[in-house]
Amino acid sequence: MVSFIFTRIILFAAAINGAVALPMNTTEPEDFSILSRSGTPSSTGYSNGYYYSWWTDGAAQATYANGGGGQYSLNWSGNNGNLVGGKGWNPGFNGRVIQYSGTYQPNGNSYLSVYGWTLNPLIEYYIVESYGSYNPSSAAARKGSVNCDGANYDILTTTRYNEPSINGTQTFQQFWSVRNPKKNPGGSISGSVSTGCHFTAWGNLGMNLGSTWNYQIVATEGYQSSGFSSITVA
């Protein structure tokens, strides 16, 4: 089947403005919860002290909303299109311990992951905690494994050729840690992700992240699927 490893042109274009790790703007816009006829329009920004990123290609009926603190919700239907949204930080860094909790109920192809980008070199990365019907490990080259936060993860890489990114159309690598077994989707979910544990393991396998950090969020993604996600990050 076609892999769910897709790129988000509009999201990447919006993220370019944050590609250089500058001090965070202390003036935050109000929470984003605008609806349109096809759902919530794509947007990025800050909400209650957290960076958020939301992108949809418009093919699905999708509603994304930021709540208080690190909370966001996403409801999508129609089994069409691509979408991804979540809350976290911009810039990311390699020692953050991320807590998440909430509800994750995918129906079809979807991920719940720590997700982000670096530059120099350009790397897109995932730490996948749970997923729906499609295991991302099936479309990637396995490099090894690591135990982080009491769970085993498969470490994998893929390469994207001439694809959109936060730095324009590029060829770049994707780095993956995929929890094995995954956390069960379909209801309440929570966990802790020590990013440094994964990043150190990747480095030991020659998978080196870039020196400049872009955003780092806990994201819900969907591809030709439906579902509901309400996640709080801290």
Swiss-Prot record:
Tell me the leader sequence span. 1-21
A single GO CC term for this protein reads:
extracellular region
Q: Please give the catalytic activity noted in the UniProt record.
A: Endohydrolysis of (1->4)-beta-D-xylosidic linkages in xylans
Gene assigned in the entry: Xyn1
The compartments listed are: Secreted
For this chain's UniProt record, which GO biological process terms are given?
A: xylan catabolic process
- Catalytic positions? 124, 221
UniProtKB keywords: Carbohydrate metabolism, Glycoprotein, Glycosidase, Hydrolase, Polysaccharide degradation, Secreted, Signal, Xylan degradation
Report the EC number(s), separated by commas if there are several.
Answer: 3.2.1.8
Q: What class of enzyme is it?
A: hydrolase
Q: What does this protein do?
A: Endo-1,4-beta-xylanase involved in the hydrolysis of xylan, a major structural heterogeneous polysaccharide found in plant biomass representing the second most abundant polysaccharide in the biosphere, after cellulose.
Provide the GO MF annotations for this entry.
endo-1,4-beta-xylanase activity
Can you give the residue ranges of the GH11 domain? 38-234
Belongs to which family?
Belongs to the glycosyl hydrolase 11 (cellulase G) family.
Q: What is this protein called?
A: Endo-1,4-beta-xylanase 1
| Annotated glycan sites | 25, 75, 167
Q: In which pathway does it act?
A: Glycan degradation; xylan degradation
